[in-house]
Amino acid sequence: MIALIQRVTRASVTVEDEVTGKIGPGLLVLLGVEKEDDEQKANRLCERVLGYRIFSDVDGKMNLNVQQAGGSVLVVSQFTLAADTERGMRPSFSGGAAPDRAQALYEYFVERCRQQAINTQTGRFAADMQVELVNDGPVTFWLQV
């Protein structure tokens, strides 16, 4: 399971001219689900994402996680993160989980975030989405479990 996380001052996702999720300061999480992923991996990745200390403390040091910084989380499914780009000029998506399994794990991940009392907004699974963000820093990390 892969999360591309970006520290943002704001972010939103729109589907068919409807804003489905919008946050102020916090994390934009682009989430990719791979074939071998399960609930245990989703739990570990959620723990890492929410615990990752990439927000500044009073001394300006990256020392706070999203909850300590009072931030929110916007989770957007992105199957392209599981692509194999090793060869050729066209990505292969054979490493991605089947859509039904990917959706179940995506929803599980979102629910785990919400259980941590963090404002968690979402896109719409498998939809064509427009994502807007203001990357703060920029600060972007690739987390994989």
Curated annotation (Swiss-Prot):
Localization (cell): Cytoplasm
GO biological process, one term: D-amino acid catabolic process
Coiled-coil residues: none
Superkingdom, taxonomy of origin: Bacteria
Motif Gly-cisPro motif, important for rejection of L-amino acids: chain residues: 137-138
Molecular function, one GO term: Gly-tRNA(Ala) deacylase activity
Catalytic activities: glycyl-tRNA(Ala) + H2O = tRNA(Ala) + glycine + H(+); a D-aminoacyl-tRNA + H2O = a tRNA + a D-alpha-amino acid + H(+)
EC id: 3.1.1.96
CDD domains assigned: Dtyr_deacylase
Enzyme class: hydrolase
Described purpose of this protein according to its UniProt entry: An aminoacyl-tRNA editing enzyme that deacylates mischarged D-aminoacyl-tRNAs. Also deacylates mischarged glycyl-tRNA(Ala), protecting cells against glycine mischarging by AlaRS. Acts via tRNA-based rather than protein-based catalysis; rejects L-amino acids rather than detecting D-amino acids in the active site. By recycling D-aminoacyl-tRNA to D-amino acids and free tRNA molecules, this enzyme counteracts the toxicity associated with the formation of D-aminoacyl-tRNA entities in vivo and helps enforce protein L-homochirality.
Subunit structure: Homodimer.
Family: Belongs to the DTD family.
Comment on protein domains: A Gly-cisPro motif from one monomer fits into the active site of the other monomer to allow specific chiral rejection of L-amino acids.
Protein name: D-aminoacyl-tRNA deacylase
Gene designation per UniProt: dtd
